[in-house]
């Protein structure tokens, strides 16, 4: 008799635990909302002339090396660029200078450190601050849309001041520091126009 009560008791407890667990999972809300908190109150237009941008450091840091291991040559608009260790380089005066690839630059394989960013029903691939989209089985360098949010800036970003407000610039893209659901993030606010 005790064995029968234990068997039915354990079976009932297991049945209730599975039922309650399932009910608890179905009541959970699946909607995700993002709360974005901005510090700056001024808005920047989609394109900012280079003359309005003041860099905190007057000299841009140039990274140049004498040789790069396992480099791949990539041609774009008649110029050779070199790719190694998830960075792009150009060759000048016997040295390889680290650069950001130009708009329209196409590669067949994304760098290993890329992150997928979904914005306005489009997938962007961000690798070291450079945005790519997939077109015809290749990845093309593009400007991101204003409002795109990233959670970390690339290593070589620069602080800039526009109309008294501090922004962050990399590859002519301006970012503003924001809070997304309590986490620090950076929102694309503008693109710097080249002269």
Give the ranges of each region predicted by the language model.
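Classical secretory targeting signals
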Residues: 1-34
């Amino acid at each position: 008799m005790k064995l029968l009560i234990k068997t039915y008791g354990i079976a009932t407890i297991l049945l209730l635990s599975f039922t309650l667990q399932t009910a608890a999972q179905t009541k959970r809300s699946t909607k995700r909302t993002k709360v974005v908190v901005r510090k700056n109150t001024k808005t920047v237009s989609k394109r900012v002339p280079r003359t309005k941008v003041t860099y905190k450091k007057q000299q841009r840091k140039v990274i140049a090396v004498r040789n790069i291991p396992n480099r791949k040559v990539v041609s774009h608009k008649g110029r050779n660029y070199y790719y190694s260790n998830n960075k792009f380089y150009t060759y000048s005066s016997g040295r390889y200078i680290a650069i950001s690839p130009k708009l329209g630059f196409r590669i067949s394989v994304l760098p290993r450190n890329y992150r997928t960013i979904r914005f306005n029903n489009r997938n962007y691939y961000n690798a070291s601050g450079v945005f790519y989209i997939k077109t015809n089985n290749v990845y093309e360098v593009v400007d991101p849309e204003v409002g795109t949010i990233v959670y970390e800036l690339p290593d070589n970003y620069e602080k800039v001041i526009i109309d008294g407000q501090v922004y962050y610039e990399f590859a002519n893209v301006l970012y503003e520091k924001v809070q997304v659901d309590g986490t620090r993030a950076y929102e694309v606010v503008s693109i710097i126009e080249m002269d």
